[in-house]
Curated annotation (Swiss-Prot):
Keywords: Acyltransferase, Amino-acid biosynthesis, Arginine biosynthesis, Autocatalytic cleavage, Mitochondrion, Multifunctional enzyme, Transferase, Transit peptide. GO terms for molecular function: glutamate N-acetyltransferase activity; L-glutamate N-acetyltransferase activity. The active site is at T233. This is Arginine biosynthesis bifunctional protein ArgJ, mitochondrial. Pfam families: ArgJ. It catalyses: N(2)-acetyl-L-ornithine + L-glutamate = N-acetyl-L-glutamate + L-ornithine; L-glutamate + acetyl-CoA = N-acetyl-L-glutamate + CoA + H(+). Residues 1-22 form a transit peptide.
């Protein structure tokens, strides 16, 4: 696996006192986060990337804020979008584009940071269209099916794009395109907002039908707050040179997103702009993946799901005000849906998240969140929630340093907690909360972080 990293659990030794701002530069990356930024990569054939400064956000004079990713040949493509009812203009535009083109013939993705172009009416849709048109002109113009460029935006809601700045600089973004690591890193940096580091990964893989072919996959994502995807703001682009038919792209992406970007939460908010896109140009050759029943499809689905999960975890590690990376694992559930709801509820609980920050082994908050997770409406009879049985429920802290788990609740009965041991576990940067429901054999995993004082500071100052 190229450009990989192994983040070993460690105790926090750094207090985060830096100020977050739009788009991150190498000089501003906190020392504790630099280990997550790759220094090299293995990037898919036929793709080029760039990131340049155009000054989308007033006052930004130094940080790139326009990202351009292109393919030298048409791509099969799919995307998963936010389910927020107030969907941003680029979401509407890009969804319609993919539907119109039948998930084929995509040549590029153009992304701006600094302004979300959300809740901007017809003018916002016109701006999204102008962005795509400017990109299309650099890629040879529109074809009979119209635009071939997906557009994304991220930043403050309710403001119009400085569209002249963007459109007037797409040519410069095209001129800056390159296929090297620095080009991909510049592209990943340009989509950042309150992120403290660019989130970029790449890896190689093979497929059963073409064992001698080395395929490549690269992806970038952004997000640090407003993260509770139901595809938060969360943007992601994954590109591969594997040959994949347009008809199977939506299903393989949805499966991956459900187990990655839709399994993380920072603050429980779902953005107006969430978009995760997958592009495949087939430049590496080999047999096209055209059937969901093929061994190649299954193999690629595993690769994409694992890759997407690793990308999504980077978002959690950069959560606004976060000092801990927390895995919530719910097992022995009557259904996967119930397990996901319980894991999600625990992951979103402010009381759980603040207790983790305070290194307080207050398992009652975990149990409380578990208990109401499946109640769909006030007054619902608790006996109707058969997926949770109090006397079968177990809760533990699982350290990530290889030591034994600390049992907090066993079959509904509280354990005498070794507070010193609990404190040791909660000092770790990485930890796991394990909930065993004892009602079946299904499971689900969520990834989240804690809440610190800095979260309030960041979001209180967001527009200043």
């Amino acid at each position: 696996m190229a450009a990989s990293f192994k983040a070993l659990p460690q105790q926090l030794t750094l207090t985060r006192s830096f100020a977050r701002c739009y788009s991150v530069s190498a000089e501003s990356i906190p020392a504790a986060k630099k280990k997550y930024v790759p220094t090299e990569g293995s990037y898919p054939q036929g793709f080029q990337a760039s990131g340049i400064l155009v000054g989308v956000k007033p006052g930004n004079k130094t940080k790139p804020d326009l990202a351009f990713l292109t393919s030298d040949r048409p791509c099969a493509a799919a995307a998963v979008f936010t389910k927020n009812k107030f969907q941003a203009a680029p979401v509407t535009f890009s969804r319609d584009l993919l539907k119109r083109r039948g998930n084929r013939g995509i040549r590029g993705v153009l992304i701006n940071s600094g302004c979300a172009n959300a809740v901007t009416g017809k003018g916002g849709l016109e701006d999204a269209s102008l962005m795509a048109k400017a990109a299309d002109e650099q890629l040879g113009g529109e074809d009979g099916a119209g635009s071939s460029t997906i557009v994304m935006s991220t930043g403050v809601i309710g403001q119009r794009l400085p569209i002249d700045k963007i459109v007037g600089n797409v040519g410069a973004a095209h001129g800056a395109l390159g296929s090297g690591h620095k080009d991909w890193l510049a592209c990943a940096t340009a989509i950042c907002t309150t992120d403290t580091f660019p989130k970029l990964m790449s890896r190689t893989f093979s497929l059963p039908s073409s064992p001698g072919v080395e395929y490549r996959m690269a992806g970038m994502t952004k997000g640090a707050g407003m993260i509770h995807p139901n595809m938060a703001t969360l943007l992601g682009v994954v590109a591969t040179d594997a040959p994949i038919a347009p008809g199977v792209m939506p299903s393989v992406l949805k499966h991956a997103v459900d187990r990655s970007f839709n399994s993380i939460t920072i603050d429980g908010d779902t953005s107006t702009n969430d978009t995760v896109a997958l592009l495949a140009n087939g430049a590496a050759g080999g047999q096209e993946i055209s059937s969901v029943d093929s061994p190649d499809y299954a193999a690629f689905q595993t690769v994409l799901s694992d890759f997407s999960a690793d990308l999504a975890k980077l978002i959690v590690r950069d959560g606004e005000g976060a000092t801990k990376f927390v895995t919530i694992r719910v097992v022995d559930s009557a259904s996967e849906e119930a397990a996901r709801k319980v894991a999600s509820t625990i992951a979103r609980s402010p009381l759980v998240k603040t207790a983790l920050y305070g290194r307080d082994a207050n398992w009652g908050r975990i149990l409380c969140a578990t208990g109401y997770a499946l109640i769909s409406e006030p007054g619902q009879d608790i006996n109707e929630v058969a997926s949770i049985v109090s006397e079968k429920t177990n809760v533990s802290f699982v350290p990530t340093d290889g030591s034994a788990e600390l049992k907090l609740l066993v079959n509904g009965e509280p354990e005498t907690v070794d507070e010193a041991r609990a404190s040791e576990i909660l000092e770790l940067e990485d930890l796991e909360i394990l909930v065993k429901l004892g009602t079946g054999d299904k499971q689900a995993t969520y990834w989240t972080c804690d809440y610190s004082h800095e979260y309030i500071t960041i979001n209180g100052d967001y527009r200043t």
